[in-house]
Design a protein with these regions (language model features):
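A carbohydrate-recognition surface predominantly in extracellular/luminal proteins
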Residues: 16-67, 119
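Sequence-level preference for short, compositionally simple segments enriched
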Residues: 44, 52-56, 63-64, 96-98, ...
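Glycan-recognition/cleft segments
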Residues: 69-95, 146-152
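Short, aromatic/His-centered strand-loop micro-motif at the edge of beta-sheets
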Residues: 96-118
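Short tryptophan-centered beta-strand motifs in secreted/extracellular beta-sheet-rich domains
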Residues: 115-123, 132-134
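Flexible glycan-contacting loops in extracellular carbohydrate-active proteins
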Residues: 143-168
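Long beta-strand-rich cores associated with HINT superfamily self-processing modules
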Residues: 192-199, 218, 222, 226-328
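Structural motif
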Residues: 207-214
Length: 356
């Protein structure tokens, strides 16, 4: 059956963990095979990122003038990377290397509102061009502004490491990161590493599954696991995961999943509204503050996406979860639109029923 909502496909175009992340805030983590030697730290010009994308997500609305990020290195060859906001001036990135200073400006006022805003700064030092944009995520109509200019500096890996490892004070910055990709990773379905997945040997934590493990599915019987994709992602802002509370979903334990993860719900209410015994709902659409919660307690999440070679429904502590990563395949259940989820949740008294 083709999903009702094409945006709710269980097959993401690419895995969210494959976005060439170099570093993420609040994490002593480097991806994409980037390593730093002692020489790189002492002589940062030996480790450079010439092209890439700096991304920062912010909790809106922003107050008046404030410093969003401020990295200062004053020993030897001085360097600065700072991000400022001002209601009138807009957003400013100040980048200093030695005696040279550049300012990249996104003139204000920037779009405000409530929710999450994303600042994107794309730089190409060899081509001597940069682009900066700010958007209010999920706004209707879309709210965004952009600017561009010339002569950006490359990023020094030693600075990136320090910026992303430093402790930050509480403020509007939800997370930030540097990637070699042209855009941040698309959000995609995933499950937490501790999710108990039903196998031929009983429940096994998702993070411990290995290729060849026989996964017990509700719609296609036993299937061998082809691959387990380990993902390291931001866990705040637009990437914040959803905590599905027991016993409303899992029988005995809470389940941590992506906001885009599809969860099966079965009951007379689903059949009454949609003439389907079971339907799939996006976890993010089920947030009600009681049975399903947005969880932003951690900065970075280690999660997994399972590849069974086809879309399938796996069981996690009594809750059926959709998985599948092959383009062109079809989910076995109808996927509800966001407004349909609201209707069903209201009929359920906003108490989600797990799939039996």
């Amino acid at each position: 059956m083709v999903p009702s909502d094409p945006n709710l496909s269980t097959m993401p175009r690419s895995f969210a963990g494959e976005a060439d992340w170099i570093a993420l805030s609040d994490a002593r983590f480097f991806g994409s095979g980037v390593t730093l030697s002692a020489a790189d730290t002492k002589q940062p010009q030996t480790g450079l990122v010439h092209t890439g994308l700096f991304v920062m997500e912010l909790a809106l609305p922003l107050a008046g003038a404030m410093v969003l990020l401020n990295h200062q290195y004053d020993q030897g060859w001085p360097r600065t990377f700072a991000v400022f906001h001002d209601l009138a001036a807009g957003l400013v990135i100040l980048h200093r290397q030695g005696k040279s200073v550049v300012r990249h400006v996104l003139p204000g006022p920037i779009p405000q509102g409530r929710g999450t805003g994303r600042l994107s700064f794309r730089f190409d030092a060899p081509a001597r061009i940069w682009e900066m944009s700010f958007e209010v995520l999920g706004s209707d109509p879309p709210a965004s502004v952009s600017s561009s200019g010339r002569n950006p500096f490359p990023f020094h890996l030693a600075d990136v490491k320090e910026i992303c490892s430093a402790q930050r004070a509480n403020g509007p910055v939800l997370w930030f990161g540097l990637t070699r990709g042209a855009a941040p990773p698309a959000r995609a379905p995933w499950i937490g590493q501790r999710t108990p997945v039903e196998t031929s040997l009983g429940p096994v934590p998702a993070g411990n599954l290995v290729p060849g493990t026989i996964i017990m599915t509700a719609d296609h019987g036993p299937l061998p696991l082809l691959a387990r994709h380990n993902l390291t992602l931001p866990a705040r802002g637009s990437f914040a995961p959803i905590l599905l509370r027991a016993p409303f979903f899992g029988l005995r334990q809470d389940l941590l999943v992506s906001a885009d993860q599809l969860v099966a719900v079965t009951g007379a209410e689903a059949e009454y509204l949609f003439a389907e015994e079971s339907v799939l709902m996006r976890a993010g659409d089920m947030v009600d503050g009681r049975t399903a919660l947005t969880d932003q307690r951690r900065a970075v999440i280690e999660s997994v996406a399972l590849d069974l070679g086809r879309p399938a429904l796996i069981e996690a502590d009594g809750c059926l979860i959709a998985t599948g990563h092959h383009a062109g395949a079809e989910a076995s259940l109808r996927c509800l639109h966001s407004y349909e989820v609201l209707t069903l949740m209201a009929l359920l008294g906003r108490t989600a029923r797990r799939s039996a």
